[in-house]
C-alpha cells in the first residue's frame, strides 16, 4: 500500500468515464430510486466506471480541478497522487483532497430532476456522501479537504461539514493557497 502525503480524488459521478456518452454527467443528476432497479444497476455499472488508471492505481484521466491542485502541490515538493475513488484501498494518505461539483444535489439540473421525482436522492449526493464516509471510516486520522465548484452548497446546508466529518472546505482559487493549506494539515 502506497502512503502519499496527499491523495486527490472525487466521487464516481465527477470522475465519470464519458466513453459511452457525452451526456454522462447529467446521469449523476437523476434520482437513484426513480428508476426501475434493474435499469439503475445497469446504468451505474455502465456509466459510473472507474477512470482509466495505471498499474499503481493512479488516475490517467481526471478533471481539471484535481489536475490544477496536483500540479501546484507537485511544484511545491509534496508527494501527491490522483486516483479514482474505486482505488482508495491502494493508498493510505495523510490528507485527502476531494473535488466536488454538486455534492448535495441542489444544483439547477439536479434539483429540477429531484423535484420531478418527489424528492428522491440523486446519484451525485449518494456517491459524494458515500466517498466521504468511507474515507472517514477507513482513515479516521486523516484530514479531509473538499473543494471545487460545488462547495457553495455547504453554505446553504449548514451542518453538513460537521455531519460528514470534513475538516476543511476550500472556496475560491485553491492554487494560490494550496501549499500553505496542505503544509498546515500535515503538521
What do the predicted segments below correspond to?
Residues 1-5, 45-47:
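Iron-sulfur (Fe-S) cluster-binding modules
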Residues 2, 19, 58, 180-187:
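N-terminal [4Fe-4S]-dependent radical SAM core
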Residues 3-14:
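Short, hydrophobic/glycine-enriched beta-strand segments
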Residues 14-22:
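Short N-terminal binding/cap micro-motifs at the start of the first secondary-structure element
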Residues 17, 54-56, 63, 92, ...:
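Detector for Asparagine
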Residues 22-56, 103-127:
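A solvent-exposed, charged loop/short amphipathic helix patch at secondary-structure junctions
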Residues 46-76:
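Short, charged N-terminal beta->alpha structural module
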Residues 65, 76-187:
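Glycine-rich beta-alpha loop elements in corrinoid/cobalamin-binding modules
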Amino acid at each position: 500500500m502506497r502512503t502519499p502525503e496527499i491523495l486527490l480524488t472525487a466521487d464516481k459521478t465527477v470522475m465519470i468515464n464519458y466513453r459511452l456518452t457525452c451526456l454522462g454527467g447529467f446521469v449523476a443528476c437523476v434520482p437513484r430510486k426513480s428508476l426501475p432497479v434493474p435499469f439503475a444497476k445497469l446504468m451505474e455499472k455502465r456509466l459510473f466506471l472507474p477512470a482509466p488508471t495505471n498499474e499503481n492505481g493512479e488516475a490517467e484521466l481526471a478533471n481539471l480541478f484535481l489536475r490544477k491542485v496536483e500540479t501546484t502541490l507537485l511544484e511545491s515538493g509534496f508527494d501527491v497522487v490522483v486516483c479514482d475513488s474505486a482505488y482508495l484501498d491502494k493508498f493510505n494518505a495523510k490528507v485527502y483532497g476531494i473535488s466536488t461539483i454538486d455534492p448535495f444535489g441542489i444544483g439547477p439540473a439536479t434539483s429540477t430532476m429531484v423535484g420531478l421525482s418527489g424528492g428522491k436522492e440523486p446519484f451525485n449526493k449518494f456517491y459524494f456522501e458515500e466517498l466521504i464516509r468511507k474515507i472517514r471510516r477507513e482513515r479516521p486520522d486523516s484530514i479531509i479537504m473538499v473543494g471545487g465548484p460545488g462547495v457553495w452548497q455547504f453554505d446553504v446546508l449548514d451542518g453538513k461539514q460537521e455531519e460528514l466529518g470534513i475538516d476543511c472546505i476550500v472556496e475560491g482559487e485553491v492554487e494560490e493557497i494550496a501549499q500553505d493549506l496542505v503544509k498546515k494539515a500535515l503538521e
